């Protein structure tokens, strides 16, 4: 119940496998990569995962209710403006979006339609439960669906992002 104090929360939100850890964000910052979150979860749930489980301090976040649901790009564009200012266009840095659903990939495709001069890159990754060795076949199938939906890149691990040159896309 998102209306309860999160110290009383239990279940999946408290023990779901996460794709990242706090060190990942420190590494992004060290490499000059600006980051934020667009979440389909309610604000309280998203903040619980980001702040309590990952230990991030007031991370940039657009959550359910802050913008229309994905694949509408409004939340993604709103967060990008918040992080970069209103500097969209071919002279701006590429903006990457990592997601684990087809709606995430379609959000990027729709952002390109809204601001065609800006380079938006869709990066797909399978959700945490498919990263188990026993689910490799399902994961491969899921990643193919992300690619077929239009993902520019599929990551096997979120940590691979550090080695990706987004200017190549």
PLM features per residue range, with description:
Residues 9, 14, 36-96, 102-116, ...:
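Substrate-recognition "cap/lid" segment bordering the active-site pocket of phosphatases
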Residues 84, 161-169:
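Short amphipathic alpha-helix with an adjacent loop that forms part of the alpha/beta core around
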Residues 62-63, 124, 156:
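Structural signal for conserved beta-strand scaffold positions within catalytic alpha/beta enzyme cores
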Residues 97-153:
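Acidic, Mg2+-coordinating phosphoryl-transfer loop and its flanking beta/alpha structural elements
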Residues 1-37, 44-47:
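Short, acidic loop-to-helix structural element flanking the phosphoryl-transfer center
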Residues 1, 124-128, 159:
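Short loop/turn segments at strand-loop or loop-helix junctions that form parts
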């Amino acid at each position: 119940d998102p209306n309860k104090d999160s110290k009383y929360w239990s279940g999946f939100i408290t023990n779901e496998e996460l794709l990242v850890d706090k060190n990942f964000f420190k590494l992004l910052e060290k490499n000059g990569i600006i980051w934020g979150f667009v979440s389909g979860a309610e604000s309280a749930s998203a903040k619980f995962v980001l702040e309590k489980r990952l230990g991030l301090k007031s991370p940039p976040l657009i959550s359910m209710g802050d913008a229309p649901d994905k694949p509408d790009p409004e939340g993604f564009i709103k967060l990008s403006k918040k992080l970069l200012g209103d500097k969209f266009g071919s002279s701006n840095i590429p903006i990457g979006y990592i997601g684990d659903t087809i709606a995430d990939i379609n959000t990027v495709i729709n952002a390109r339609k809204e601001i065609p001069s800006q380079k938006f890159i869709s990066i797909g990754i399978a959700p945490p439960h498919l990263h188990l060795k026993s689910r490799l076949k399902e994961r491969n199938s899921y990643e193919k669906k992300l690619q077929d939906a239009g993902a520019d890149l599929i990551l096997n691990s979120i940590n691979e992002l550090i080695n990706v040159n987004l200017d190549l896309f």
